[in-house]
Amino acid sequence: MENNRNFPARQFHSLTFFAGLCIGITPVAQALAAEGQTNADDTLVVEASTPSLYAPQQSADPKFSRPVADTTRTMTVISEQVIKDQGATNLTDALKNVPGVGAFFAGENGNSTTGDAIYMRGADTSNSIYIDGIRDIGSVSRDTFNTEQVEVIKGPSGTDYGRSAPTGSINMISKQPRNDSGIDASASIGSAWFRRGTLDVNQVIGDTTAVRLNVMGEKTHDAGRDKVKNERYGVAPSIAFGLGTANRLYLNYLHVTQHNTPDGGIPTIGLPGYSAPSAGTATLNHSGKVDTHNFYGTDSDYDDSTTDTATMRFEHDINDNTTIRNTTRWSRVKQDYLMTAIMGGASNITQPTSDVNSWTWSRTANTKDVSNKILTNQTNLTSTFYTASIGHDVSTGVEFTRETQTNYGVNPVTLPAVNIYHPDSSIHPGGLTRNGANANGQTDTFAIYAFDTLQITRDFELNGGIRLDNYHTEYDSATACGGSGRGAITCPAGVAKGSPVTTVDTAKSGNLVNWKAGALYHLTENGNVYINYAVSQQPPGGNNFALAQSGSGNSANRTDFKPQKANTSEIGTKWQVLDKRLLLTAALFRTDIENEVEQNDDGTYSQYGKKRVEGYEISVAGNITPAWQVIGGYTQQKATIKNGKDVAQDGSSSLPYTPEHAFTLWSQYQATDDISVGAGARYIGSMHKGSDGAVGTPAFTEGYWVADAKLGYRVNRNLDFQLNVYNLFDTDYVASINKSGYRYHPGEPRTFLLTANMHF
């Protein structure tokens, strides 16, 4: 069993490995970079290199003024071409191209996660997802039909975006009108009744105006899971004025609706590490795994959401070297769901007979009825200039943002128990009814920032940046009085049972100072080494707009607590080789997270907890030859508690839901003018599970490999087909597990997707 929990290769100490990697990669990269260069006496031939469609050279965010190859951060840019070739229809699928990033956590106890529940380097990053550099709120699945590229930055992003997760951020870049006309359409069918269509129309009007329309529709069952369905539709019209001139105006709108049947997971009975929760239920130790197709929800389970986003961006080129941009965005994400979760503790199991096939587990109804809104105005100025002999690449700006969240209180839904091995979903508890016991959160933020990259010599650069956020968060919540169970409150005199009673009404204000500094030295024209240090903070309420009263319990959102603080050090090297078609990177990193909440000996709580995530990461992106494209990477990361209570089920100091080893690689080859072949593999190492007192549940998930493949055929310039096969070898694996360990989400089995792409 121990062998299954480790990456199937000999492990090296990370520092030794990285030192060897840097020593080894430098001469190899130098040799590759020199390939095709002429001697001094040879005739010089200037030949432009075609940019790789797998390795965008520049971030679309103006806050990152340097090319990806000269950015002193670990950054992965997933291009639209990669997304299309892999048939990745949502953000979670696209992020499979980034090692160690994924939806590994299935929720707390009786609660389950929904949407893009992303973990990165030991931390929940689902609230650090941005669209065009603006925070996108909501636990929904984000479709890629209107996405130009996805930018993943590892390490603190507080200097770039303000309050954020301590270990990274994700930025989805929207499609914009272009100065050319064309139509791209696709129609897909696949396993589990998968049906999807997209349309991308760009039309030039006159010399400087263009309109673009992106449309999407998708209906599918979840492969390998009975009753689980997904249905979503989207439309994204946009118009641009002044293209090719010094003044440009972009107007964008996005509307997406989703009607899904959520998946609460299946019991972990029979998984490695599972044992019955009591002597009386010992039969479960040898009764075998449940059928992974089983659905433990009800016919009334649903997950509906609506996203509406309107954006206006104006750009003005003051001169050839200076541009000012102003962006205004309003966005609203509404979501409501009823999702069933199962609990398998000793008190949750009913045994009508000795036959385990008659046993039941209790069901819990997870409910949510929430509305998230954001209104922001952001101004950015970028400029390149010299002071004496020192070059400057400056990005500076101000931001005004109001974010609000309303969680509508709903009456509890009671569900009957469910048979462990033969679940029945034909139950109709009804929908949600609001009871007025709402929770309201609002955060107003004013931010100012300035970044500069200083070109000291031709080969040596210094960079730094600072951001000041002034924030004010207000929060109030109510509870329906007279209920029972955890969190119940009695009704005040004269107040009827079930009436909402305010339990929290508080606010918190403060200032956050985040900063970063780095240095880069070009060893050659195509290769560099760099160092970087960054500081990021997350204040109470910064993650979910919820606050807790001063002195009340162990919540990190207490108003008397300090912001969580993360410090990251990184040293790395980046090389553009093979005529700059291929980017190779390697980095060694360490992130220390401070001010974590821990319990004192007297039962009170303080912020003396510390976590650390350290390791190394290597990556590759671009073209090996003009016909051979590749993107991938490998990371080794050790995430531990340095000070405070251990939170892993096995009692170790490891942080849960973080694979120590992770690998991903996708490669595509254009075999002929009309035929292309692609293949990829991913490895997710063993992960520790969190601890919450559950008895007998698995303490870890086993590592696994998954392979995918693609075959493309071009009929003519207007039509091509592609066949994608996912989980080629039909690997059985645990995709995510919840904190208690009573339930998990099985990985998707082997599936097929056939797509017709049309171009006009």
UniProtKB/Swiss-Prot annotation:
Where does the TBDR plug domain start and stop, copy by copy?
67-175
Source taxon at top rank: Bacteria
Gene Ontology CC entries for this record: cell outer membrane
Pfam families on file: Plug (PF07715), TonB_dep_Rec_b-barrel (PF00593)
Which residues does UniProt assign to the signal peptide? 1-31
| Residue ranges annotated as motif TonB C-terminal box | 743-760
Q: Which CDD domains match?
A: ligand_gated_channel (cd01347)
Pinpoint the TBDR beta-barrel domain residues: 180-760
Q: Which UniProt keywords apply?
A: Cell outer membrane, Ion transport, Iron, Iron transport, Membrane, Receptor, Signal, TonB box, Transmembrane, Transmembrane beta strand, Transport
> What is the predominant subcellular site recorded for this chain?
membrane
Is Transmembrane found in the keyword set? yes
**GO terms for MF:** siderophore uptake transmembrane transporter activity; signaling receptor activity
The protein's location, in the record's own words, is: Cell outer membrane
SUPFAM superfamilies with a match to the protein in the record: Porins
Q: How does it sit in the membrane?
A: Multi-pass membrane protein
Q: Which family is this protein grouped under? A: Belongs to the TonB-dependent receptor family.
Q: What does this protein do?
A: Involved in the active transport across the outer membrane of iron complexed with catecholate siderophores such as dihydroxybenzoylserine and dihydroxybenzoate. It derives its energy for transport by interacting with the trans-periplasmic membrane protein TonB. Can also transport catechol-substituted cephalosporins. Receptor for microcins M, H47 and E492.
Q: What's the protein here called?
A: Catecholate siderophore receptor Fiu
Q: Which organism is it from?
A: Escherichia coli O157:H7
